[in-house]
Amino acid sequence: MQGSVTEFLKPRLVDIEQISSTHAKVTLEPLERGFGHTLGNALRRILLSSMPGCAVTEVEIEGVLHEYSTKEGVQEDILEILLNLKGLAVRVAEGKDEVFITLNKSGSGPVVAGDITHDGDVEIANPEHVICHLTDDNAEIAMRIKVERGRGYVPASARIHNEEDERPIGRLLVDATYSPVDKIAYAVEAARVEQRTDLDKLVIDMETNGTLEPEEAIRRAATILAEQLDAFVDLRDVRVPEEKEEKPEFDPILLRPVDDLELTVRSANCLKAEAIHYIGDLVQRTEVELLKTPNLGKKSLTEIKDVLASRGLSLGMRLENWPPASIAED
């Protein structure tokens, strides 16, 4: 029993009933009242829509140009074959996001997933899954199948606008169901701990396609949920700060030579004689200081003030950290 009235009970794994290799029931208890539905619904949604897995996304069938055609010697039409390929349960080695597998079959009878040729990085979890039927001994079918890793459900229509220009004729797109979970349901029953009878027991009933064990699927779903909730544990601002462009320390015009002001020869020579080489040097001088410059009179001073004003500058400005390193090194 919890140590205080404010402490929440923590569920423990009570039972895993393995009905088959792909079907299991997982029971957790005790849960505080209402938490059965809270956790059950959250896990159910993640298991159905957010579990990563592998699925067939494209197929090329020899002699077939589009999905609305038929193939001689094959009982099913092409749309039925594509629908059957959606049910292919494929496990691909970690580290590979896409693989290609092939199928070549001839002779009368069913064509099943076990007829597919693949390398050691691929495993077919449902080898008895029927893809199509060949109707006579001379019939044959050959196809190249693309399997990709993804998450959730992605219809073929969502990929058409991205690939239509590059997709060659005869490459057929397949609706991709990446989730390894086929069915998921949960039930909340009454549970009891000592004198408390208002507690919940959560029973999760789940079936997978065989590429992932039910127990591991629930473990992964719980991990996804916990990672998403981490942000709420510490509500500090965790946004990545925007990178701001560094503003130059000085207005670029201040780094330009005095000659760019196009002063009269007399005024320009007077400034050079006083070692005023850059506009930044000039704007820091006052009128009084410039009038003390030999051969620089009021007419030249007025010219300098007017030229600076036309550029939004004036005499007597204060520039911190002047001169910049690039000028000081010169």
Swiss-Prot record:
DNA-dependent RNA polymerase catalyzes the transcription of DNA into RNA using the four ribonucleoside triphosphates as substrates. One of its GO terms (biological process) is DNA-templated transcription. It comes from Vibrio parahaemolyticus serotype O3:K6 (strain RIMD 2210633). It holds the Pfam family RNA_pol_A_bac. Homodimer. The RNAP catalytic core consists of 2 alpha, 1 beta, 1 beta' and 1 omega subunit. When a sigma factor is associated with the core the holoenzyme is formed, which can initiate transcription. Gene3D superfamilies: 5' to 3' exonuclease, C-terminal subdomain (1.10.150.20), DNA-directed RNA polymerase, insert domain (2.170.120.12), RNA polymerase, RBP11-like subunit (3.30.1360.10). Transmembrane segments: none annotated. InterPro entries: DNA-dir_RNA_pol_insert, DNA-dir_RNA_pol_RpoA/D/Rpb3, DNA-dir_RpoA, RBP11-like, RNAP_asu_C, RNApol_insert_sf. It comes from the Bacteria. Keywords: DNA-directed RNA polymerase, Nucleotidyltransferase, Transcription, Transferase. Residues 1-236 are annotated as: Alpha N-terminal domain (alpha-NTD). Residues 250-330 are annotated as: Alpha C-terminal domain (alpha-CTD). GO terms for cellular component: cytoplasm; DNA-directed RNA polymerase complex. Its EC number is 2.7.7.6. It catalyses: RNA(n) + a ribonucleoside 5'-triphosphate = RNA(n+1) + diphosphate. The N-terminal domain is essential for RNAP assembly and basal transcription, whereas the C-terminal domain is involved in interaction with transcriptional regulators and with upstream promoter elements. This is DNA-directed RNA polymerase subunit alpha. Belongs to the RNA polymerase alpha chain family. It is an enzyme of class 2 (transferase). GO terms for molecular function: DNA binding; DNA-directed RNA polymerase activity; protein dimerization activity.
